[in-house]
């Protein structure tokens, strides 16, 4: 599928974005391991989250829906999962794969995880190594680094794991495995990554302690089913925020967005660059901070990003690069080598595609340098099958002169079903 983008004057109005992808995944997984019923509202009906639902059903969990974002999970408890009769196909979802590995590590059965061609290229050893230290066994390609991967669960022992990378997926996999180990399991990271797993496990009744960059969980808890309303996904909202920021005269409000402090780096950066941003009606929803984000177009300035803020906006870097291309001055992004192992190598993908618009972009080993302020022209762009690349280049096209065409845009529903329709709600031609 191709997506055609024509330049627009500005964005105006109120919109909402689909439910948070990270929280939707975790709600299904933790709900399945709890006793009793978990009801989820505003569940993200994207392909990645549906892969999580499918895998848990394959292990005997009864799940009703999702219908209009509503889901009912009949939890089986920590010991209730059953050996799947077939391969567990996680599609394009790295989150499903890595978090499930943590759960499967503690099961008394063998399972095999596979995925699509893109996922089969993504590294898994960062997750399998600590899980092996806990007592699970793995057999996969490239020395247990690539899917397909067989997982032989077993009796797990707790560990104190020092992660070499700030990755919520690695941390969550170890914490989920820690549910099945008697005693305390801890994960220490070089910088704080998103904390949705800790918040959700705590809400379901697990004993979780957080101190600086270390999270500690007590094994074998009694998790109890609950009702969860998933906030809007700030990573999806980021595309609308940048679109408004780069189009002078824009003024939009995105309602009910998760503003978790481990995910709000995009707000900080856009403010730094000069965008008018206001958070209204801040509230707590199921343990997660939520607010309505108002953003106005402005003349943006270049900025520098590195260090601890990077894990707080790692998924937003492609769209931040678009903002930088339309800003005055130079933007430097460092310490972001994690981008190389996403759905595409997002460093080289961003460089290649922004250059097609006429932007001046330099590739670094761990980031980018973008010289902003040059007027951009519409282009024919590749998505690389990467949903965030497709949407970032679509936003770049809104402010460019001439038409932009995004090839392979059918990957967008992975995280943002209805992206084009939401955009149309606020476009002023």
Curated annotation (Swiss-Prot):
Membrane-traversing stretches: none
Pfam annotation, one family: EPSP_synthase
Gene Ontology cellular-component annotations: cytoplasm
Residue numbers binding phosphoenolpyruvate: 21, 94, 122, 169, 346, 388
Pathway: Metabolic intermediate biosynthesis; chorismate biosynthesis; chorismate from D-erythrose 4-phosphate and phosphoenolpyruvate: step 6/7
CDD domains cross-referenced by the UniProt entry: EPSP_synthase
SUPFAM superfamilies reported for this sequence: EPT/RTPC-like (SSF55205)
Main location: cytoplasm
Top-rank lineage group of the source organism: Bacteria
UniProt-recorded Gene Ontology molecular function terms: 3-phosphoshikimate 1-carboxyvinyltransferase activity
Catalytic activity: 3-phosphoshikimate + phosphoenolpyruvate = 5-O-(1-carboxyvinyl)-3-phosphoshikimate + phosphate
PROSITE patterns: EPSP_SYNTHASE_1, EPSP_SYNTHASE_2
Annotated GO biological process: amino acid biosynthetic process; aromatic amino acid family biosynthetic process; chorismate biosynthetic process
Sites where the protein binds 3-phosphoshikimate: 21-22, 26, 167, 169, 315, 342
Subcellular location: Cytoplasm
Keywords for this protein: Amino-acid biosynthesis, Aromatic amino acid biosynthesis, Cytoplasm, Transferase
Active site, renumbered: 315
Matches recorded under PANTHER family: AROM/DEHYDROQUINATE SYNTHASE, PENTAFUNCTIONAL AROM POLYPEPTIDE
NCBIfam families in alphabetical order: aroA (TIGR01356)
Function: Catalyzes the transfer of the enolpyruvyl moiety of phosphoenolpyruvate (PEP) to the 5-hydroxyl of shikimate-3-phosphate (S3P) to produce enolpyruvyl shikimate-3-phosphate and inorganic phosphate.
Family: Belongs to the EPSP synthase family.
Protein name in UniProt: 3-phosphoshikimate 1-carboxyvinyltransferase
Native organism: Desulforamulus reducens (strain ATCC BAA-1160 / DSM 100696 / MI-1) (Desulfotomaculum reducens)
Recorded name of the encoding gene: aroA
């Amino acid at each position: 599928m191709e997506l055609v983008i024509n330049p627009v004057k500005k964005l105006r109005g109120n919109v909402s974005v689909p439910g948070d992808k990270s929280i939707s995944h975790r709600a299904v997984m933790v709900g399945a391991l709890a006793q009793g019923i978990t009801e989820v509202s505003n569940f993200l009906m994207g392909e990645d989250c549906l892969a999580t639902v499918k895998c848990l059903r394959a292990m005997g969990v009864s799940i009703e829906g999702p219908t209009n974002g509503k889901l009912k999970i009949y939890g089986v408890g920590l010991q209730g999962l059953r050996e799947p009769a077939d391969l567990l196909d996680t599609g394009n979802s790295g989150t499903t794969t890595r978090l499930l590995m943590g759960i499967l590590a503690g099961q008394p059965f063998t399972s095999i995880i596979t995925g699509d061609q893109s996922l089969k290229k993504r590294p898994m050893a960062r997750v399998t190594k600590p899980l092996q230290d806990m007592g699970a066994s793995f057999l996969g390609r490239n020395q247990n680094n690539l899917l397909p991967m067989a997982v032989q669960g077993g009796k797990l022992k707790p560990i104190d794991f020092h992660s070499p990378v700030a990755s919520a997926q690695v941390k969550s996999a170890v914490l989920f495995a820690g549910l099945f180990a008697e005693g305390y399991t801890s994960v220490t990271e070089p910088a704080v990554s998103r904390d949705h797993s800790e918040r959700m496990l705590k809400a379901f009744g697990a004993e979780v302690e957080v101190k600086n960059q270390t999270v500690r969980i007590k094994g074998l808890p009694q998790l109890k089913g609950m009702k969860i309303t998933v906030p809007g996904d700030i990573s999806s909202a980021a595309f609308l925020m940048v679109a408004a920021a780069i189009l002078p005269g824009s003024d939009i409000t995105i309602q009910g967005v998760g503003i978790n402090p481990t995910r709000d780096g995009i707000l900080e950066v856009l403010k730094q660059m000069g965008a008018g941003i206001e958070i209204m009606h801040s509230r707590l929803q199921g343990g997660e901070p939520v607010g309505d984000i108002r953003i106005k177009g402005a003349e943006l300035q270049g900025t520098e990003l590195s260090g601890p803020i990077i894990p707080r906006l790692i998924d937003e870097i492609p769209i931040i690069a678009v903002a930088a291309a339309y800003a005055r001055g130079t933007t430097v992004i460092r310490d972001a080598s994690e981008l190389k192992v996403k759905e595409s190598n997002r460093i080289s993908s961003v460089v290649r595609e922004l250059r097609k618009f006429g932007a001046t972009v330099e590739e670094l080993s761990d980031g980018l340098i973008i010289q902003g302020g040059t007027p951009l022209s519409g282009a024919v762009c590749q998505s690389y099958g990467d949903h965030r690349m497709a949407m970032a280049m679509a936003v770049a096209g809104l402010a460019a002169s001439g038409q932009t065409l995004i090839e392979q845009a059918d990957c967008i529903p992975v995280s943002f079903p209805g992206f084009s329709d939401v955009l149309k709600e606020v476009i002023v031609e």
